[in-house]
Amino acid sequence: MPLVALGVADLFNFVDYSKTSLAISAAAIAFNPTFWNIVARREYRTKFLTRAFGGNAQVACYFLAVTIFGLGLVRDFLYERALRDQPSHPLLEGTYVKYAAYALLALGNLLVITSTMRLGITGTFLGDYFGILMDGIVTGFPFNVTSAPMYYGSTMSFLGTALLYGKPAGLLLTAWVLFVYIIAIQFENPFTAEIYAKRDRERAKAAGTSKKEL
C-alpha cells in the first residue's frame, strides 16, 4: 500500500480492537484515579486509613502514596503490553516522529518530577485529605505553566510512548488518559479547594476569638 494512502484518517484503522490487552489497559487507566479519589474522600470523611495506622496520618498517607505508585507501575506495564499487541503505522515510524516522542517523554517526566519536588510526597499523594495541608499555593515551576503538571506530564509521557512505538492504539489510549484526567480534575480541584477554604475559615474564626479575648 502506498505511504500516501496511509493518511491521518487511516490511523485508527491500524487499531486492533479485538485485543483483550487494549481493553485491560483502558480499564487500568480509568481505575487508578477512580481508586485514589474514592479512597482519599473516604479517608477525609472517616479517617479509616489514619485509624488503621494507629492515628498516624503521615504514615497512612505514605501507604496510599506507595499504593498509588504501585498501581501506576502496573498501569504502565499494561499500557506497554497493549502497544506491543498492536500494529504499527508507517506514518508513525519516521525519524522526526521519534524525535517528537523523545521530546514528549522528556518534557512529560520533567513536569511530573518537578511537581513532585515542589509538593513533596504528601503534597503529591493527597496529603490534604489526611489533614496534612500545605502553607500556601505553590506557584513556581511547573505550576506556573499548568495547574495540573502531574496529569498533563503523565499524558505527554503516554503520547511520547505511543509515538516511540509507532502505534495508533497508543494515540487512542492517550486520548482516553487525557479524558480520564480531565474528569478527575473536575472532581479533585473543587474538593481540595474546599478543604483549604475550610482551613482558612477556621483560622479566621480562631483569630477573631483571640482578638475578643484580648
UniProtKB/Swiss-Prot annotation:
Membrane topology: Multi-pass membrane protein
pH dependence: Optimum pH is 8.0.
UniProt-listed PROSITE patterns: SAM_PEMT_PEM2 (PS51599)
Residue ranges, Lumenal side: 1-19, 41-52, 123-165
Molecular function terms from GO: phosphatidyl-N-methylethanolamine N-methyltransferase activity
One matching Pfam family: PEMT
Transmembrane segments: 53-74, 102-122, 166-186
The protein's annotated pathway: Phospholipid metabolism; phosphatidylcholine biosynthesis
EC main group: transferase
Cited Gene3D superfamilies: 1.20.120.1630
Entry EC number(s): 2.1.1.71
Free-text function comment from the UniProt entry: Catalyzes the second two steps of the methylation pathway of phosphatidylcholine biosynthesis, the SAM-dependent methylation of phosphatidylmonomethylethanolamine (PMME) to phosphatidyldimethylethanolamine (PDME) and of PDME to phosphatidylcholine (PC).
Name of the molecule in the record: Phosphatidyl-N-methylethanolamine N-methyltransferase
Organism this protein belongs to: Neurospora crassa (strain ATCC 24698 / 74-OR23-1A / CBS 708.71 / DSM 1257 / FGSC 987)
